[in-house]
Amino acid sequence: MCCDYCFQGEGVSEGIFSDIDDLKNFLQDLPTGDTLDVKFIGGEPLIYTDSIKRMIKEIRKLERTKDVHFRFGLTTNGLYFKSLIELIKEGYLDEELVKVSWDGKYSKYIRKSCYDNGFVNNAIYSIIKECPNVTVRIAIHLKNVDSIEESMLALLSRGAKSIELYYIMEYPLYRDEWFIHKCKKMFEKVARIYSFFSFRYVNWESLKYNSDKETSEASKCSHLGSHLHIDKNGDLYPCGMFVPDDNIYVTTQWKIGNLKSGIDFTKTKELEMELNKEVGCSKGCKNVNCFECPAVNLGEIGSMDKRFMQQCELKEIERKIYNKFHGVG
């Protein structure tokens, strides 16, 4: 896709995970709840649709010997929309665990001429028509902030049930007053859309569920401690952002085990101590919707508890609009 705000750099990590027997043995012994979600990530995972099908079939065999129900999802750019729809319709993927990234109706980030805006938009609309509970994620950036309202209406008019507006890591314009003003107008329009359409607006969920928490607790990463990332070599990480090969920010490995050897609890304890440090930003902030990636903070600033603090004003605007909409003080 070659998005001009992509943090991955020019390097491409080739290869896919294939140690299905080691994975099954690991999952068999792993303590779990009644349900365990498995998500395929990339790159673009739908390039390997046949491999995904094989892995899902094998993993589901564990339901015969282990009291657990597996659900499967992935994150995609949506271009392989026929493969995605097939995986959902055939019962391989759980529709609500699928996320599709989109830059909106007037995206200008497709460098390959065969992927023009019309092709990308039609791919997204095809997915929504067949699978309306898939979450469509729209990045907030300069070249689409004025058209996000139109893009959301295009999705909702086609039956979309779940939309998220997501922030780009280290995007400098989030601190510029003129861009903040643009975003404020955009968020106000989104709130008006929400009053007319029934859909899941992911941005407001953290405000809803975290309203009674302290800001420092609410803004912690929801992945760390509840997720395990398995890379193509079978190594275990707290999440995909801590894998050095895939994240240009991380310079030290935070590997916490391997499928064969299991989880390194000494390393997880070290990680826990890092994450429990007091957040290094304003003590007076009330933005329970705040979030910064600990892995990026570690790689760029040198510590997981430090903060860029460049989304603060936008998060506060979102929070105030949410409170006004819901009549919160």
Residues covered by each model-derived region:
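Radical SAM/AdoMet-radical enzyme domain recognition
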Residues: 12, 23-41, 48-168
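N-terminal pre-triad scaffold of radical SAM enzymes
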Residues: 1-4, 34-39, 46, 230, ...
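Canonical Radical SAM [4Fe-4S] cluster-binding loop centered on the CxxxCxxC motif
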Residues: 1-20
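A general structural signal for short secondary-structure junctions and capping/turn motifs
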Residues: 90, 218-221, 227-230, 272-274, ...
